[in-house]
Amino acid sequence: MEICTYFKSQPTWLLILFVLGSISIFKFIFTLLRSFYIYFLRPSKNLRRYGSWAIITGPTDGIGKAFAFQLAQKGLNLILVARNPDKLKDVSDSIRSKYSQTQILTVVMDFSGDIDEGVKRIKESIEGLDVGILINNAGMSYPYAKYFHEVDEELINNLIKINVEGTTKVTQAVLPNMLKRKKGAIINMGSGAAALIPSYPFYSVYAGAKTYVDQFTKCLHVEYKKSGIDVQCQVPLYVATKMTKIRRASFLVASPEGYAKAALRFVGYEAQCTPYWPHALMGAVVSALPESVFESFNIKRCLQIRKKGLQKDSMKKE
């Protein structure tokens, strides 16, 4: 009763502030507990329930290679798709030496070349197989930060062709097989550059292409969820790979192996996710900052990358 009397004696504006503050605190605590459950307690799906075969594009280096080893460890057979036959053989031999029971098929496909011919080979390779998982990992970025007017036509074409057209057409080739069996999982590799930060200056075409992948995936997630197909876009930030040109992993920079292990725990859940929890933490910090503050920092960082890239280019010419 005393509490009720106390509240009644307070001005209306103070009561409104109290209610709004309580809601904000409750929302923060709920988000924190939910995130803890998702990243540390939620069980992963049994990936073999989708099927016994998995397709991975871009499996010869970095994240794609780590995905291949993780899936082989979980007992799935692999169809590896990349442009370099020698690298495909090397990664296949490495996987077989560690997981001798794994069946591996390879498809040579240049995503910057004749995509339709490559897609035709993929269709032929999956005929009669219960392909349950597709990981659209093949992608490319800029060699270094550039103003949009400095980006040459070849780079623009390749960025769109590999990141957009390749992902779209490979998905369209594999999806009918999954629909027949009414089960499957499609994982498209997006980027935090398109989903976790306000803008990604000096990488505009790359960010735009990955934004397409993100929205494309969300639409497919809604279209095919009732058909038993789980479609997901994963949006990491920094991973130590050749594409990012980051050599060493750290707390905020995932190793390919660390990322792939975390990523597979998220398959079958959200339409969009950031599996490596330090990346999600970075995204939360960025979203809490005023856009102008983050953009000021990011522009300085990108201009430093651009300066180093131009210096390397000039040294090559000499």
From Swiss-Prot:
Biological function: Beta-ketoacyl-coenzyme A reductase required for the elongation of fatty acids precursors of sphingolipids, triacylglycerols, cuticular waxes and suberin. Responsible for the first reduction step in very long-chain fatty acids (VLCFAs) synthesis. Decreased expression of KCR1 (RNAi) leads to plants with fused vegetative and reproductive organs, and abnormal trichome, epidermal cell and root morphology. Cannot be complemented by KCR2.
The keyword Lipid biosynthesis is assigned to this record: yes
Gene name per UniProt: KCR1
Catalytic residue list: Y206
Pathway linked to the protein: Lipid metabolism; fatty acid biosynthesis
Tissue-level expression: Expressed in green siliques, flowers, inflorescence stems, leaves and roots.
PROSITE patterns: ADH_SHORT
Protein name per its UniProtKB record: Very-long-chain 3-oxoacyl-CoA reductase 1
Protein localization: Endoplasmic reticulum membrane
UniProt membrane topology term: Single-pass membrane protein
Taxonomic lineage: Eukaryota, Viridiplantae, Streptophyta, Embryophyta, Tracheophyta
